[in-house]
Swiss-Prot record:
Alphabetically ordered keywords of this record: Ribonucleoprotein, Ribosomal protein
UniProt source species: Caulobacter vibrioides (strain NA1000 / CB15N)
Annotated protein name in UniProt: Large ribosomal subunit protein uL29
Cysteines joined through disulfide linkages: none
Entry coiled-coil feature ranges: none
Signal peptide annotation: none
């Protein structure tokens, strides 16, 4: 997910996206632990997307 995409979202959309990413991260962690994950790079992508969303949410809350 690109940062420009994230900045264009409303805080409600960001919160919804954050929840869905956390669920996906949870599922991928279990798959990784059992050795079933096929796209291992997706774990890092999701982690970084979560960080980006949290950063934008904080910036919007401060503004």
């Amino acid at each position: 997910m690109k940062i420009a995409e994230i900045r264009g979202m409303t805080p409600d959309q960001l919160a919804d996206t954050l929840i869905s990413l956390k669920k996906e991260q949870f599922n991928l962690r279990f798959q990784a632990a059992t050795g079933q994950v096929e796209k291992t790079h997706r774990v890092n992508e999701i982690r970084k997307d979560i960080a980006r969303i949290k950063t934008v949410l904080r910036a919007k809350a401060a503004a």
